[in-house]
């Protein structure tokens, strides 16, 4: 007859009760651990106080040879009492912890069953409200641990790559062990890998550009401030597709730089075209030789090249002539011409 008059509870009410019990069990576990440590602390302090009182009473009551034996017996007995009491206290609180943990696991399984029941029985709007209220907490509590594991593995891989590239040739190679456990595959990650472009698949394990900049000192920061050469005075190269940072450039060169994104491979064109300098011919030298060391223009075909006259009878006089001083006198030229005519 009791079942006829009993009222069935809604899944939302049951879920609320189960969630409250789960929070209560978690608080109880924290209280049990705190009680365990505090009980051991007070137990140790009580044993030390009792042992010190017994030692003082023994030292004042008994004579010299007897009080030594009694003191040794008290120390041995106190040690046995401390170890035995510690074992009993730890066993008691371990039993309480196991029982509370089992109740917590049962409550969590009951919660999952109720959530599945809500998905199957209630309407979409009511089920969505209940799931948004209770299911987000569990997912938010599980995802950070998985993300932290993935981030930790990625950091280990980056540390190994950095140690390999920065290592000097005279140093020994020391490689940090990387865990060989496979990363848990998810459908979202597999779908993203299927939708990746060939450039992204080829550069999925690419390493950043080396070398890494050393850490700036106080002197470097002062010089950067006065010379306007620090990171604050430079423009960042940001990809227009994935908004990834691809290094920095000087403000004067920023509008004319085109770069390819390290993450997605998109070619970011320069915002401006560089200035084109006019092509100018270099000036001509005195003997048809340009200042850049090249020969001058070729004379036309009809024009005969001018052949300079060579002196058939070079002088053997070692005295410097007038031509060496920069000018030739007319009498010397006439004398040379007459000498050539007589010989011919």
Swiss-Prot record:
Entry's Gene Ontology cellular component terms: endoplasmic reticulum membrane; endoplasmic reticulum tubular network; membrane; synapse
Main location, first listed in the record: endoplasmic reticulum
Topological domain spans for side Lumenal: 61-68
Zinc finger (C4-type): 239-264
GO biological process, one term: regulation of protein localization
Molecular function per GO: zinc ion binding
Annotated TM spans: 40-60, 69-89
Cytoplasmic side: 1-39, 90-344
Region spans: Disordered: 136-155, 171-192, 275-344
Keyword Transmembrane helix included in the entry's annotation: yes
Pfam families: Zn_ribbon_10
Coiled coil: 116-140
Compositional bias of kind Polar residues: 140-155, 312-326
Basic and acidic residues: compositionally biased ranges: 327-344
Keywords, comma-separated and alphabetical: Coiled coil, Endoplasmic reticulum, Membrane, Metal-binding, Transmembrane, Transmembrane helix, Zinc, Zinc-finger
Subcellular location: Endoplasmic reticulum membrane
InterPro entries assigned: Lnp (IPR040115), Lunapark_Znf (IPR019273)
Membrane topology qualifier: Multi-pass membrane protein
Function as written in the Swiss-Prot or TrEMBL entry: Plays a role in tubular endoplasmic reticulum network formation and maintenance. May be involved in central nervous system development. Has a presynaptic role in neurotransmission. Likely to operate in synaptogenesis by regulating vesicular transport or localization. Required for correct localization of rab-3 and snb-1.
Protein family (similarity comment): Belongs to the lunapark family.
UniProt name for this protein: Endoplasmic reticulum junction formation protein lunapark-1
Lineage per the UniProt record: Eukaryota, Metazoa, Ecdysozoa, Nematoda, Chromadorea
Designated gene of the protein: lnp-1
């Amino acid at each position: 007859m009791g079942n006829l008059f009993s009222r069935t509870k809604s899944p939302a009410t049951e879920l609320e009760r189960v969630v409250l019990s789960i929070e209560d069990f978690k608080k109880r576990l924290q209280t049990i651990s705190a009680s365990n440590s505090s009980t051991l602390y007070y137990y140790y302090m009580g044993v030390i106080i009792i042992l010190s009182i017994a030692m003082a009473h023994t030292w004042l009551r008994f004579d010299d040879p007897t009080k030594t034996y009694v003191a040794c017996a008290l120390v041995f007995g106190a040690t046995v009492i401390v170890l035995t009491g510690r074992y009993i206290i730890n066993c008691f609180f371990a039993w309480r912890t196991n029982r509370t943990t089992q109740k917590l696991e049962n409550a969590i399984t009951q919660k999952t069953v109720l959530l599945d029941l809500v998905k199957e029985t209630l309407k979409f709007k009511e089920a969505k409200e209940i799931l948004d209220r209770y299911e987000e907490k569990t997912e938010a509590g599980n995802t950070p641990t998985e993300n932290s594991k993935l981030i930790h593995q990625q950091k280990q891989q980056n540390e190994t790559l950095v140690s390999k590239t920065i290592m000097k040739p005279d140093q020994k190679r020391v490689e940090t062990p990387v865990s060989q456990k496979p990363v848990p595959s998810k459908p979202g990650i597999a779908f993203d890998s299927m939708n990746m472009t060939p450039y992204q698949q080829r550069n999925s394990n690419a390493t950043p550009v080396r070398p890494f900049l050393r850490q700036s000192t106080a002197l470097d920061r002062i010089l950067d401030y006065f010379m306007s050469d620090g990171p604050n005075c430079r423009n960042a190269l940001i990809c227009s597709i994935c908004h990834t940072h691809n290094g920095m450039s000087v403000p004067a060169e920023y509008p004319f730089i085109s770069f390819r994104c390290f993450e997605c491979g998109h070619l970011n064109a320069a915002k401006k075209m560089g200035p084109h300098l006019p092509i100018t011919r270099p000036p001509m030298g005195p003997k048809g030789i340009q200042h850049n060391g090249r020969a001058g223009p070729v004379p036309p075909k009809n024009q005969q090249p001018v052949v300079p006259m060579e002196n058939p009878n070079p002088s053997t006089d070692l005295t410097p002539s007038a031509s060496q001083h920069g000018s030739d006198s007319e009498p010397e030229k006439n004398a040379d011409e007459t000498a050539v005519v007589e010989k011919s």
